[in-house]
Amino acid sequence: MKQFNILFLFSFLIFNQLNAQTGCAGCVVDLPTLPEDTIYLAPTINGEVGVYYDGNLSFRMPKTTDPVNANDPGTPAGLNISEIKIISMVNVPPGLSWEPSQTTFDPDDQTDGCVKFCGTPLVSDTFEIGVVVEAQVSILPAQTASFTFQLYIAPATSSNDGF
């Protein structure tokens, strides 16, 4: 019975993780004028509990380690990045799903992308959404890195028009 419960819990968690990545097709990349080799993450749009959310988050991935070095001096500058993969996204507000425009980027061809969030938020909070990426840098083994961004979900508003 214990094995069944563990299997059920594991299946439930996996299903929910996969479910969070579906149903939000059609994000639109909308970036300001930027340098070609840079790191950029657009600001998020606030949501409200109980109100349908439909938002895009545009980004630009780096082509080399130069912009990474500018933010993290421990990363050596001057190395080409041959591939970047979005591995996971955690702490997405309950009720929201997400879907990226793509999960694997070849910086020689494509560094711009977006993630679409949609659904009806169930909980109010400022969510620190974590993103895990894996980068293949020149001849080095693949490197995993993570970063966070905030998404604010406001409490539901109520009106008292009838009293």
Language-model regions: role of each:
Residues 1-26:
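Bacterial Sec-dependent N-terminal signal peptides
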Residues 26-31, 132-133, 140-162:
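C-terminal edge beta-strand
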Residues 31-71:
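Extracellular ectodomain surface segments
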Residues 39-43, 99-104, 116:
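Short structured motifs
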Residues 46, 56-60, 116-120, 130, ...:
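Generic structural detector for well-ordered beta-strands
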Residues 62-106:
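Surface-exposed or secretory-pathway low-complexity segments enriched in glycine-proline
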Residues 108-116:
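Aromatic sugar-binding surface patches on proteins
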Residues 115-139:
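A short beta-strand micro-motif common to beta-rich folds, especially ectodomain repeats
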